[in-house]
Amino acid sequence: MINFHIITLFPESFSSYLGESILARAQKEKKIAVRFYDPRDFSKPTKIQAQKDKPYLRVDHKPYGGGPGMVMQALPVVKAIEKALTNARRKTKNSRKIKIVFLSPSGKQFDTQYAKESAQKYEHIIIICGRYEGIDARVKKIFKTEDVSVGPFVLTGGELAAMIMIDSVSRQVEGVLGDFDSLEETRAASPDVYTRPEVLVYKNKKYQVPKVLLSGNHKAIEEWRKGNIK
């Protein structure tokens, strides 16, 4: 079983994706578990006029040295990670089974091999999701995190990247995928696929399924698929 500990300001953004299909089943069958830690829960409350008497849990501030936007403060994130580590250590005495990931577009490239290794080596993966202009860099220094990127692009926050990691790593956990899904998982790339109807008519033009796929000749079909991988 793999436990994902997600440090995020927006835990509700995960609900729909984790509550459906393979990941929902994996959680129900206790193949994986996902727990959230909101840095706001570890921040000291202040009051701002815009919210009258409601406490405002601040987790960001202006960057030192100037620049646009706001930066997530270190202490609320540190405390959230500490809580995640405490929960992880209750379940495993081997610290080598715990991994802390700091999501960053400049980090190590996440891929299928990374997902496989993570599923094999770790029982607890703590994923830190940034927002705004980023997180105070001292968080990385304190915990000696591993910077990981899901691609050479910038996202509004780390939540989407975290979902990608959860999905990909979970698929490598034994028992999460069925036979059909396992077949899909072995493909680095996939050929074109077709289903009924055999002839699709769109704007008076006919689009037909390749004849080889209708032939019943499994060897020919396999050769066709190998030649049409994209």
Across the structure, where does each feature detected by a protein language model lie?
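SAM-dependent methyltransferases
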Residues: M1, T195-K230
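N-terminal nucleotide/polyanion-binding subdomain common to many enzyme families
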Residues: M1-L85, I221
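Hydrophobic/aromatic beta-strand patches that form the interior of the parallel beta-sheet core
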Residues: H5-I7, R35-Y37, V101, I125-I126, ...
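Short His-Asn-centered micro-motif
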Residues: F10, L103-P105, I128-R131, G151, ...
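Conserved RecA-like P-loop NTPase ATPase core
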Residues: G67, G130, N217
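S-adenosyl-L-methionine/SAH cofactor-binding core of RNA-modifying enzymes
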Residues: V71-C129, D136
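Structured adenosyl-cofactor binding patch, chiefly the S-adenosyl-L-methionine
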Residues: I135, V139-S182
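Internal, active-site/partner-interface "lid" segment
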Residues: L160, Q172-K211
